[in-house]
Amino acid sequence: MNNITIVTAFYDIGRENWIYYNRDTSYYFECFERLCQLKNKIIIFSQIKFKPQFDKIISEKKSNLVVIYEEIFETNRDLLEKIKKSQENLQNMGGLCNDGKPPEYWCPEYILVNYLKSYFCLSAIEQISDIDDMVSWIDFGYVKKQKQIPESKIWRYDFDDKIHLWNILDIPKQLNILDTIKNNTVYIQG
């Protein structure tokens, strides 16, 4: 079984100020510190404003943590504007699930971070010379409970050498894309 390098990212999308689905930055760092218990290599993309928090994690918990500081909101202003316009179009059409409260419908920064997950993985592969043969994305705030960390402190799985996505719903033969977007239906994750 191959070793797996974990890639993740954390960017301030203002979530602590959201009316719905709000969480503060400290919550995410608590989750990430649990992830850092793993012996796997971890590469994180983030903003320079979080350098003190990452420096503390490196000095106290995970000395081999690799942090790549990249200001994605600055370098992707045009894309953020396009996302914002698309979200406004959806809102104007109406009929969004949960009255349009999910961030997919109104937070362009949320969409951008999710959109860039494959970019972060590829960028880690290109930039880090001692990366493992297998790379996996795990969300920065995924490890909410200690029981999610294996006793061995090593996350392994016998993947073959392909990109893996998980179907969480069967995809129908005929799919109305607009309805899927309006209902925020997720068929694939990975």
Task: Spell out what each predicted region is.
Residues M1-Y27:
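N-proximal low-complexity "stem/linker" segments adjacent to membrane-targeting elements
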Residues Y20-F32, S118, I149-I154:
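Well-ordered, non-membrane alpha-helical segments in soluble/globular domains
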Residues T25-K41, K56-I57:
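Short, acidic, metal-binding catalytic loop of nucleotide-sugar glycosyltransferases
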Residues I43-Q47:
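Short internal beta-strands
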Residues E60-S129:
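Active-site-proximal specificity loops/subdomain of glycosyltransferases
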Residues E109-W166:
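GT-A fold catalytic core of metal-dependent nucleotide-sugar glycosyltransferases
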Residues H164-I177:
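Short beta-strand-to-loop element that shapes/binds the nucleotide-sugar donor at the catalytic cleft/hinge
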Residues T180-G190:
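A recurrent flexible, glycine/aromatic-enriched loop bordering the glycosyltransferase active site
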